[in-house]
Amino acid sequence: MNPGFDLSRRNPQEDFELIQRIGSGTYGDVYKARNVNTGELAAIKVIKLEPGEDFAVVQQEIIMMKDCKHPNIVAYFGSYLRRDKLWICMEFCGGGSLQDIYHVTGPLSELQIAYVSRETLQGLYYLHSKGKMHRDIKGANILLTDNGHVKLADFGVSAQITATIAKRKSFIGTPYWMAPEVAAVERKGGYNQLCDLWAVGITAIELAELQPPMFDLHPMRALFLMTKSNFQPPKLKDKLKWSNSFHHFVKMALTKNPKKRPNAEKLLQHPFVTQPLTRSLAIELLDKVNNPDHSTYHDFDDDDPEPLVAVPHRIPSTSRNVREEKTRSEINFGQVKFDPPLRKETEPHHELPDSDGFFDSSEEIYYTARSNLDLQLEYGQGHQSHCFLGGNKSLLKSVEEELHQRGHVAHLEDDEGDDDDSKHSTMKAKVPPPLPPKPKSIFIPQDTHSAEDGNQGTIKRCPSSGSPAKPSHVPPRPPPPRLPPQKPAVLGNGVNSFQLNGERDGSLYQQQSEQRGTNLSRKEKKDVPKPISNGLPPTPKVHMGACFSKVFNGCPLKIHCATSWINPDTRDQYLIFGAEEGIYTLNLNELHETSMEQLFPRRCTWLYVMNNCLLSVSGKASQLYSHNLPGLFDYARQMQKLPVAIPAHKLPDRILPRKFAVSAKIPETKWCQKCCVVRNPYTGHKYLCGALQTSIVLLEWVEPMQKFMLIKHIEFPMPCPLRMFEMLVVPEQEYPLVCVGVSRGRDFNQVVRFETVNPNSTSSWFTESDAPQTSVTHVTQLERDTILVCLDCCIKIVNLQGRLKSSRKLSSELTFDFQIESIVCLQDSVLAFWKHGMQGRSFRSNEVTQEISDNTRIFRLLGSDRVVVLESRPTDNPTANSNLYILAGHENSY
């Protein structure tokens, strides 16, 4: 045993009286105690020693504390070993930890943060001068005494810096406060005491924002992002709230390169901590804890107040008078037939694959335009494509084991089929993706079937001012599946492309049905019973088209958006509506007793369903939310049974534990104007992008966790007003481009030019001031090199370069005789909506295929994701209750 390690064998209760347990540390419980001889208070950590346990860790902590005597270090009193328990006695800090304090007071003031940072740096300067490092600096390990002194505690992970171990090749600490070189210890080869300075910067952000950066991420995901070469050091979110000195202090402490990061002595000379700072700042903080003034602290994730007007939680559909005649449009709704909606190649797939790698959408009122061959290539390869990710997992495994030992019970599941992120993180990129050149116009490679287009690029990059995003040095993604020339995907522009059904004979449907039948027999799928959804009944297998069917009469809600979801347990199909009054749902299996039920009481302007996860822009701050749909429905069902319900949605986040919450805010997404979701057909990755007031957030779907995770936050001055916001997938780029505008083309044969922000790039491309924006109402990427652009009364089908897609079988321009408000792409046509009706025009001939017009009604498309939902109100009373319709009647299968 170390000679400097003295250990008393006497009964510690002869010297100390335990008063109460005040917390649990890394290796044991902590008690408040009183010295029976002197009356002095002490903190005693009681550690139960297990057989075979590594005693060196405990010994290390005792040696560390005994050797350190400094005003900013918790004082060590002595140690006792009694039976199988070790008692470590140390100085008692009555003020508690900063983490406990800010949970009561809210964010610390800038001067209070400066004072705490200075005292912490003084303690670290002392430790580092003695050849030691702390390695776990965070708010929970910075304590205050009753008189406002700052003390560093918890040396359970401290380590001496000796000549033989100048860099610790170990991995211990809390991930969110961890320096990049610590996260990448296996690859970088170690770290030194400068990792403590990084933690000081993270702690400063924690005290200002009540949590460290990336705290919403799984610890393993946070580590993975920190090890990527394009990782950007975090910053304070609110630029205006804090001084330039504070921003610069955080920037210096969070210098990514440890060789350039200032040490404690250097950082103590920063103006942020050299300003006049007295202990009274900490005393004021303690007074606020002891006498909390709830009126002065408002959580900046404050929930919405209850609406002034009571909103019913259950809204029944009004019964139509039997004598009341149908409107002209409702009569036409039952007569005009529509082809199925077109499933875009860049549209995320909501279903989970079955064992054969196919999706069975028999439970949906939806139809795909993609061929079985396309699906085979995509999903058949999808199972094999995971193999390239299988690299060495030693770093993540060691990290996960260490996190588990340190109390992080949650971990990533070892999902062989879906855990892309964890496997990516173990790979070393051989060659980073090439940076694009920096001219005004950027060439984007085209598919070989677009040889007739010119080779001048036209997609422009808008500036990512402030902190341009860097491309990630990640393993190369698998090459996109190549379609055989004789069977290209739908909407291809070659002679061999599938013919879009501009006629009413259903030839395309029959063609694909025959292919499906052949494929199913080959797979022997015919013997497998299909899952059935409890919604509107499917039509017979003879293709008869679909029509609009009324599903609700007299809806009082001010609806913004709509989507649908199928409950995996009951197989019931639900429509989900986002409205001013909240999120509501309608069970299509109960249309005989139609009623809407409220799921979430806050204003909602955008909805999207991914598997069993509902994404929404909700609340008075227009923040992105993630909802667990089964949990949301279960909670709503339980609340209906209670005589008096306490809505969990209204409970503050800290009262309701995260694991019990069915709805959670996605951090860094407040004031979201628009959102879009896209799937990269080259990689299968799915992305969610949000347009905030002055920035863009990019999130990626993580399959094992079934949630979107933030991967990019790009500062960017948004156009005002922001008319359109879509993502465009381009070849050989990891992340999609973000299109924020469309201007008129300038190059030869160029009709439009896409104004984009490139999350993959380290450089900025500035939008030319003399490029006028066009009145674009809709942009959607149908295929890899096929984009539909809606301009006023015209729809143009272009490639990524903005040139018209020329084909003998497809029309590249569709013209309408009204101002287009919204569109839905059908199998054979584009269905355009205007104020008093809708009109469909053939992809092949630009001829009218369907038309419904009723000047007595005002129509509005509420959603076309999975199910087309339409709203209708009387023209002479636009504020009257609305009727709701869906496009239904297609066979629910591939």
UniProtKB/Swiss-Prot annotation:
- What ranges does the record list as Basic and acidic residues composition bias? 340-353
Q: Which residues form a coiled coil?
A: none
All copies of the CNH domain together span 556-867
What chemistry does it catalyse, as a reaction equation?
L-seryl-[protein] + ATP = O-phospho-L-seryl-[protein] + ADP + H(+); L-threonyl-[protein] + ATP = O-phospho-L-threonyl-[protein] + ADP + H(+)
Documented EC number(s): 2.7.11.1
Family that this chain belongs to: Belongs to the protein kinase superfamily. STE Ser/Thr protein kinase family. STE20 subfamily.
This molecule's function is given as: Serine/threonine kinase that plays a role in the response to environmental stress. Appears to act upstream of the JUN N-terminal pathway. Activator of the Hippo signaling pathway which plays a pivotal role in organ size control and tumor suppression by restricting proliferation and promoting apoptosis. MAP4Ks act in parallel to and are partially redundant with STK3/MST2 and STK4/MST2 in the phosphorylation and activation of LATS1/2, and establish MAP4Ks as components of the expanded Hippo pathway.
Which protein are we looking at?
Mitogen-activated protein kinase kinase kinase kinase 3
